[in-house]
Amino acid sequence: MHVNVSMHNGTLRFGFETEEDEPTQRKSSMANMSCYVKGPETWKISEIHPDHMALSALLMVRPWFNRSLKMSFGVSQKFADACQKMKISVSPVDPEVIPYDSESAKYVGLAFSGGADSTAALSVLPPTTIPIFLDRPDKGSSLYSKDAALHSVAKLSQLGYDCHIVECDLESIREPIGFPTDLSNGVPTILLASKLNIFGIAYGTVLESLYCLGRLQYKEYTETSHYKNWWNVFSESGLPISFPTGGISEVGTEIICSKSSIGALAQSCIRGSIDQPCHFCWKCFRKTMLRIALDIEPPNAELVTRLLESGEVRTKLSQLPISHENVLIFAFSRLDLDLYPKGFVQRFDHEDSLTYLSHWYSKSRGLIDIRIRKFVERKIVSYIGANGPQEELRIQSWDNSQRINRLESLSLD
């Protein structure tokens, strides 16, 4: 695949030209052959490191090309070698391109969404962290609402954070609309790294996603293809990844937000308005049940009834396993199930109340950049404490497969 990059009045445009047998077919399709990233009008292409443009392109089209990206600019040999380890050829290599020097940079950038996990990440990162929000432009009819996230960014700016809102339509490349890869929301941070003096990029990814807790079995993240594919290429581009919440469950991020001075700004629902979640989507159901179980918000029978009438919620609850099942087991083990449909007792029964989800899985410390690791560790422990050796073994022994095999799908009819 050919990648052409140009800039005009602070707007960086990526154009993609496919070769034979491209774009390859996946669960999603490549619906558009271009996208843009809109920075300040004074932004110049010379302020973007070539390796960062190439890394951004890789994050935009990774699912759909056949092992070769041919750029309209040269990249460093170091970056090209890192891509070769992913079995991807990136060309041309320009011997005059010096790798990005993150050692002299000062700040960590956070791919910020405004949700609970992202806000918890910001709560444990240094106060000099730069939150960067990818602002998806409105296109046609959509349930998506960014009002709450933009409100959060505005409030954080008032508190002294160096926040940036970057309009970017890379999600429109994909059909159905969404991020091509799970790290694509970091593209604005990557592209602004040189201009903003950023030495690394942080994501609000949580324990459930990183270690597959809540799915069928625990997986050691450093042994996954995700780690093997992405960790090195980010590091070799001079922007090592940090997962400050990688050892924290959704349970822990809610607890952090309930204690953090900025936690009240978090809103995970992307369909509601400011301070008014839609209370109809799956995320609202999961977060509401958890917050009630943690006594962060009071029980509300009327709200729960409304959530259980949602078609989306009912569909999700009928799955085996349910997405983030461990979080729901934690929540319902602390709620009066007599107040819920009768099938909940069997569906969410578990021999373990999963108390360890309230605390930090400290084995994840290696996924936090060494320059901020001690600070982040202290902040996490001050909010939720750390699991002991026995609890960490219980995390590593998570296996939900036999339990799922003997269960029947939950029916709410």
Task: Give, region by region, the residue ranges found by the protein language model.
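Nucleotide-activated chemistry modules centered on ATP-dependent adenylation/adenylyltransferase
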Residues: 1-15, 56, 60, 64-68, ...
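Short Lys/Arg-enriched alpha/beta "domain-start" segment
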Residues: 1-49
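Extended, charged alpha/beta regions that create polyanion-binding interfaces
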Residues: 30-65, 70-77
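Conserved adenosyl
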Residues: 113
